[in-house]
Amino acid sequence: MSKLPQVKGDRLINALKKEGWYVDRTSGSHVIMRNGDRPGTKIIIPVHSKTVKPGTLSNILKKAGLSAEEIKRLI
């Protein structure tokens, strides 16, 4: 597995949109995304001015079914 990229929340949201995820709603500084192909699965993305922490990014990618290489390609 390659190293996770450093990415901000807004860029991660745009990358996930390319994979079929959509913004369901926002709650404060967090965006909740869903995918029609994966009912019941939601991803919560923090949208702050800093990059998403590696552990958080790893969990987001795991829920989305994406690898580090795939997210680098999408960003």
Where are these regions (language model features)?
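N-terminal first-folded block
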Residues: 1-27, 36
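C-terminal structural segments of small proteins and small subunits
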Residues: 50-75
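A short, structured beta-strand/loop element
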Residues: 23-59
